Structures are given as structure tokens and as C-alpha cells.
Curated annotation (Swiss-Prot):
The chain crosses the membrane at residues 38-58, 75-95, 108-128, 135-155, 181-201, 215-235, 244-264. It is a multi-pass membrane protein. The lineage of its organism: Bacteria, Pseudomonadati, Pseudomonadota, Gammaproteobacteria, Lysobacterales. Its EC number is 3.6.1.27. This is Undecaprenyl-diphosphatase. Belongs to the UppP family. The gene is uppP. One of its GO terms (cellular component) is plasma membrane. Bacitracin is thought to be involved in the inhibition of peptidoglycan synthesis by sequestering undecaprenyl diphosphate, thereby reducing the pool of lipid carrier available. Its main location: membrane. It is found in: Cell inner membrane. GO terms for biological process: cell wall organization; peptidoglycan biosynthetic process; regulation of cell shape; response to antibiotic.
Amino acid sequence: MSDLISALLLGILEGLTEFLPISSTGHLLIAEQWLGRRSDFFNIVIQAGAILAICLALRQRLWSLATGLGERANRDYVLKVGVAFLVTAVVGLIVRKAGWQLPETLQPVAWALLIGGVWMLVAEHFAGKLPERDVVTWKVAIAVGLAQVVAGVFPGTSRSASTIFIAMLLGLSKRSAAADFVFMVGIPTMFAASGYALLEMYKEGGFGTENWADVAVAFVAATITGFVVVKWLLGYIKKHRFTVFAVYRMLLGAALLLWLPAAAG
């Protein structure tokens, strides 16, 4: 397989999995077993494609918030997005400096996929018993910020899975409202994470030698695919539960745990 086709597939995979509650990190690690490992810079660029995708998909919502800051409800919402991001940034930086992060290898990812699938089923079951609410409380904002840190510590957890369900359990029980808030918080979080990673790479000596055609193709693929996925998901969850994603995670996690010993042998 050519490097260009490999880059295209990885870009599509990033766009498909970044916003679904199935872990983009886990899927990229799995894909790299067959498509080859790419540089950290390549992975940052395809995540930038996902960032652009969600900004485009939510452009009307972002514009509405930006132009409606005169309304108290909009100011309150934006402030809570900011607080959730700050919690992630501060606690995440402390965790990173302390080295509290599992290695991005297949075994912890497999366990995270499996356990995360169970968590999704249990969380949605209990959240479904709550009265439907679409108001973001301060408790939800802080918890979402902390849940993003947890997702960073445990590769394969999925940022969207950990945050959407903690928001639902803590009172933001309407699925579409929980997803909307989580995606809004994800925009500054992903921007900051990518910027921090680029800064660290620069300090360590630059970005190395890249095939810019591969990088460009992967970026465009991640952007287009991510845009389609976000639009589809926001429509899907208005009428459906997350059960299919939970079952998929459990099956994939179990399959990986069964495959790993055979691959090692």
C-alpha cells in the first residue's frame, strides 16, 4: 500500500472516530499495526482537521453564541464552556507534568474500550431514569472538564464517551444537549492540546521531515469525514441511544484482548 493511500485512510479514520464515543486514539493505534506508524506531527495535523470539521459543523451555533453575548443565557453558557476548558487545562497540565498517563499501547486501549463500553450502557441506563433536562449546571461544567482529563490519562477511553455520560448522569440528561456542550468544550480543548504538542515538538528540535502531500491529504480527509460524522451524530442521538457504540466498543476490546496473546506468540 502506498504512503498516500495509507495517509488517506488514517485521515478518514480520525474523522470517523474523533467525535464518536469509540476512541480515535485506540483506532489509530490499531490501524498503525497495518498502515504503519506516523509521526507525532502527522497525528497533530489530522486532529487539526477534526477541529476544523467541528467548527464548520457547529458554525451556526458558534455564531449564535458569539453574536448573542448580550443575552444572559448565552453568556452563562459560554462561561461554563470556559470553566470546563480551564479545569481540563489546569488539571491536565498537572497530570502531564506528574507523568500520570498510561502508555499508548494496545493492551490498555483494549481494556479501556471494553470497560468504557460497559460504562456507557450503565450510565445511559441510569441517566434514562432522570427527567429530561437541557440546562448546563456548574457541576456539569466542572465534571466535564475533569472527565476530559481522565480520557487523556487512559488511552482508549474516548473523550466524548467519558464527558457525554458524566454530563447526563449529573443532570444534563438530554442527549443532544449533553453532546452539544461536550463538543463546544472540545473545540478549545483540542486547539490547546494541539498547540501544546506543537510547542513541545518545536522545543525538542522541530518537526522533522514530512511528506507534505501525505499530510495535506490526511488533513482534508479528516476534515471532510469529521464534518459528516458530527452532523450525522447530532441528528442520530435525538432519536437513538448510544447502545450500538457501547456494544461495538465491548466487542472490539474483547477481540483485541484475545488477539494480543496470539500476536505476541
